[in-house]
Amino acid sequence: MTTAPHALALDVRELHAYYGESHVLQGVSLDVGEGESVALLGRNGAGKTTTINAIVGFVRSRGGTVRVGGRDITAKAPHQVAAAGVALVPQGRRVFADLTVLENLTITARTNGGGWDLARVLELFPSLERRLANRGDELSGGEQQMVAIGRALLRGPVLLLLDEPSEGLAPKLVAEVGDALIRLRESGLALLLVEQNLALATRVAQRVYVMNKGTIVFSGTTAELAAAGDVEARYLGI
């Protein structure tokens, strides 16, 4: 097992959540250090997206704590979690089809975006510059993912959560998204990446957690995961 850096951007302890009577998160604990990139892995139904949704307030937790930068955000409403510096890039991207790229990027932007402005987003994703006047429904899946990430960055987060950013993308676009996430990590932004693409996750992340049936079954560095072939075989289908 490997511990995270002392200063934590995210600290989740013994998180429990239910869907009806189904106990879907059973004491999940994980953390992300300031400026660190961490991946949360597991098969479909393992509880990864539910964990993300419980952190941001879309699913109400029924036990445990969530802290961002030391601030308790347990069971807070989504807008309160966002105000604490958490931004989510949701599964499926959710770009507004009838808005332009520029409008999609800036619709939720903060005036004090924590060092992020439109020019910096376009530096990260230069192909979007020529698409600013295009509608969301005119974009490829990869371009929509870039817009979704850029929109989240313009919130000025201290912690960026990404739910399956490679889903539905061609390999070349997966590589481009990975390049961007590495640059974000190198900029000092803390990342928690939910992903089923193991190659992307281990390329971007410094540490990984593996989930199965609502619990954490492995925590360690990417090198430790690679050395633990039984974990990949049992819980990741590899």
Model-derived features with residue positions:
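Glycine-rich phosphate-binding loops of nucleotide-dependent enzymes
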Residues: 2-238
